[in-house]
Amino acid sequence: MQADPTAHLPQPQRDRLKHIELRLRFLGEVRRPDLIQRFGIQSAAASRDLALYKELAPENVDYESRGKRYLLGARFSPLFAVPSAQVLSWLTEQLGDATAPSSEALLPCLMPSRLSHPGLDTLACITRAIHMGQVLSIDYHSVSSGESSREIVPFALLDTGLRWHVRAFDRKSQTFRDFVLTRISKPTPKLGDEAARHERPEQDVQWTRIVELDLVPHPDQPHPEVTHMDYEMPGGVLRLKLRAAMAGYALRKWNVDCSPGHSLRGPEYRLWLKDHLALYSVETAVLAPGYPSNKGCAT
């Protein structure tokens, strides 16, 4: 196993070098102000860290003098091993970029782990495309239609609680849709190809539309006051505002009975959607438990 070339460095500096590499690999670029803002260091210290990273991994980074930024090198090879879960938490919450997760928790705590994780190389190509506004050529593997080649314009990651998706405009179907990250292979940026106006996220009606959902204790529950306590329901109603593109995933994750007559049975259905018409024309409503619709956006 190759020795860690940063092992002799102080931990704070190793953390900054790791941050440089994360930005290069998953955003495609890093600038001196990124380090200054993230770590509260002086400009001179940020310059030294960037110079040191380039010295340790010269193939990983190219300097663009015009934009005063460091870009991902064509022969990039990571210095740091990072789990995909840690990368995703950093991308979505700015957490976990400094140190590896501790093997010892402060308190005993158990949580279900994900059964699947996206490959880091695929994830990196997609996140760079999102950050830089690139068009991607991909091979996509669908449960219903098998493998196909597509061009997509990605703009956001979606965590459904079970797996990760990328929201993108699909040039093959000429629609906005969700693609499961683990089903994407051979992602390649189409350099010089820019997104047309109708392919941009502000044109995605399901993305820009916000739906307001009122959830109440399921009428079949003998003790609704317990649900009031669990979900901190003022007035017995939990009001949510969600993007239409995310609504169906969220309702499925929370096992919300979305049938008009609260007809679903079982202890898992603690909540009921008070007005199922709130999901009218929401494409992901097909995923909502009990919702009376046969239309959806299966990918």
Residue ranges of predicted features:
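Bulky hydrophobic/aromatic content
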Residues: 72-141, 253, 260-264, 268-273, ...
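Long, contiguous hydrophobic alpha-helical segments, chiefly transmembrane helices and signal peptides
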Residues: 46, 53, 158, 164-168, ...
